[in-house]
Amino acid sequence: MAQLDTLDLVVLAVLLVGSVAYFTKGTYWAVAKDPYASTGPAMNGAAKAGKTRNIIEKMEETGKNCVIFYGSQTGTAEDYASRLAKEGSQRFGLKTMVADLEEYDYENLDQFPEDKVAFFVLATYGEGEPTDNAVEFYQFFTGDDVAFESGASADEKPLSKLKYVAFGLGNNTYEHYNAMVRQVDAAFQKLGAQRIGSAGEGDDGAGTMEEDFLAWKEPMWAALSESMDLQEREAVYEPVFCVTENESLSPEDETVYLGEPTQSHLQGTPKGPYSAHNPFIAPIAESRELFTVKDRNCLHMEISIAGSNLSYQTGDHIAVWPTNAGAEVDRFLQVFGLEGKRDSVINIKGIDVTAKVPIPTPTTYDAAVRYYMEVCAPVSRQFVATLAAFAPDEESKAEIVRLGSDKDYFHEKVTNQCFNIAQALQSITSKPFSAVPFSLLIEGITKLQPRYYSISSSSLVQKDKISITAVVESVRLPGASHMVKGVTTNYLLALKQKQNGDPSPDPHGLTYSITGPRNKYDGIHVPVHVRHSNFKLPSDPSRPIIMVGPGTGVAPFRGFIQERAALAAKGEKVGPTVLFFGCRKSDEDFLYKDEWKTYQDQLGDNLKIITAFSREGPQKVYVQHRLREHSELVSDLLKQKATFYVCGDAANMAREVNLVLGQIIAAQRGLPAEKGEEMVKHMRSSGSYQEDVWS
């Protein structure tokens, strides 16, 4: 029989509490409220200061019988919620409103009227965690004691009056796939709520999110129609927003938003707290390229947060608020016949009192497209279909109708080509779609979202500067007829080029308004905020760590090693620190190659860097291969309570590493393979296996 070691004992202990934690839906490892998140609602929110947080009261005040709540991190769930609200109103006559989960309370949902319905569109973030705006909602319904205002207990089925619809957005490359919607749905069922239709699940990992959503909603509408006796009618476009051109204002008017994110930025007096709703315009202290090979660039940037009251911890994320490239702004304005009036000032107002205006107003067409709209995003088949009524001719209309109704044809002509909306329409006809109301574009195109990067510095070493390590995206994907260029990384490359003396930066042929609205970003500034992460070093620096981070997945581990080197320099005991790093070639894209030598001098034998170069030998070698080669080392460190970290690609690398680790544990301990897999799962639940991955 295999001898029990420390890891086995830890796993046995975890088995006792892990099962309880699992069946209480993750309460024990639920993400804490983000300390960097905004304490107030977003601009134009439905529940502004002084307004009610009682959703039942709000629905009664505004005459609504359907609320669509969303928990969204990148804007997709919010977009789906808006689409459901619009479709419910136009097709079925529902009186709909969209609601941000963090803007309302939940203690009175046991009093939700039986003649109304609530939708919950819930994204899962990271390893089964709620999105930032859904943390309190998640904790309320999945906690041990759900306390409603009426005092009703769970045994009394307090949500028996609540009719609800649920759809989740997840990624099957993560272990806890669609955990948010599954756990909330289970909690609602336990509390007696009545779900209408099935709880839908969209899979971003398989690239089928949009089609999953479209396939789910039709039977859902049928079930809801039967439950609420709804009558379907022909859907005719009814604007959610009223967009008017204001000839009395010019772009030079100080009240016109030209890209400023908030009113205080517009007025030239930005102030904290800086958050996901209020970025800090941060100076870039330093920028350089770690490597440049053909169309591949990798950037290192130092962003100063001095004087902002922003703080971060090693392992956190920084969010960069991008600007759309000039070529894409021009393309969009040309396709929709707005090129000649790009500087016209427009006012945007919600026709319904509950509608949240996603763009600061007044603004201009140019500013809206450049700074506020995700015009380079993948195209929704449902949105393309709505444009048929506004096509410039019958031939174009017929093509759009076919694209909207035939998912295989749409996949061939649009999805495979990686077209954004303007590119898709350009492929149909050279005629402008001038008849498309700008209100429809605001409704159908999501708000331009910040992009998140793992911080590659230690807050102990440089508390006022944040490092970013990012590969610039400019790739030709299989099937695409053009280069697909990253919105934010090319923007950052342009900033780097400008800072380093290029008077006319044009990364991969793109140009940007580098100085920002009204030159407020002059001097090389970029809007940022910080987001908390659970990806953290052990509190005890003597505890061993094993890190697996190929490519830019090494970013947070640079911060980890930087921190441990600083602690060692102060005389603190630092445990074994092992990094598995992979790249193509040692002389091409070995990130921070010289810097590791400095840390090696500081940490001595406590730092071990094991490399995998995939294109130097006859066989491709990846980090998971090196991990297997060093099975004994990995096993020995796990026996010493090592924490295991993975950062990088979720779809392939992270899955392979997870599999190999289970095999290592089983082989080194003489256990069945399934026991090794089980032990890795319990390492995850105990926090000794952590991931910071993306797909």
UniProtKB/Swiss-Prot annotation:
Cofactor(s) this protein requires: FAD; FMN
UniProt-annotated binding residues for FAD: R451, Y452, Y453, S454, T469, A470, V471, G486, V487, T488, T489, W694
Domain Flavodoxin-like intervals: 66-221
Cellular compartment(s): Endoplasmic reticulum membrane; Mitochondrion outer membrane; Cell membrane
EC number from the UniProt entry: 1.6.2.4
Induction pattern: Expression is induced in the presence of benzoic acid. Expression regulation is particularly complex, involving regulatory promoter elements, differential promoter use and regulation at the post-transcriptional level.
Annotated binding of FMN, by residue: 72-77, 123-126, 169-178, 204
Transmembrane parts of this sequence: 9-31
Lumenal side: 1-8
InterPro entries xref list: CysJ-like_FAD-binding, FAD-bd_FR_type, Flavdoxin-like, Flavodoxin/NO_synth, Flavoprot_Pyr_Nucl_cyt_Rdtase, Flavoprotein-like_sf, FNR_nucleotide-bd, NADPH_Cyt_P450_Rdtase_alpha
Signal peptide start and end residues: none
Top enzyme category: oxidoreductase
Main subcellular localisation: endoplasmic reticulum
Family in the record: Belongs to the NADPH--cytochrome P450 reductase family. In the N-terminal section; belongs to the flavodoxin family.
Function text: This enzyme is required for electron transfer from NADP to cytochrome P450 in microsomes. It can also provide electron transfer to heme oxygenase and cytochrome B5. Involved in ergosterol biosynthesis.
Protein's recorded name: NADPH--cytochrome P450 reductase
Species assigned in the record: Aspergillus niger (strain ATCC MYA-4892 / CBS 513.88 / FGSC A1513)
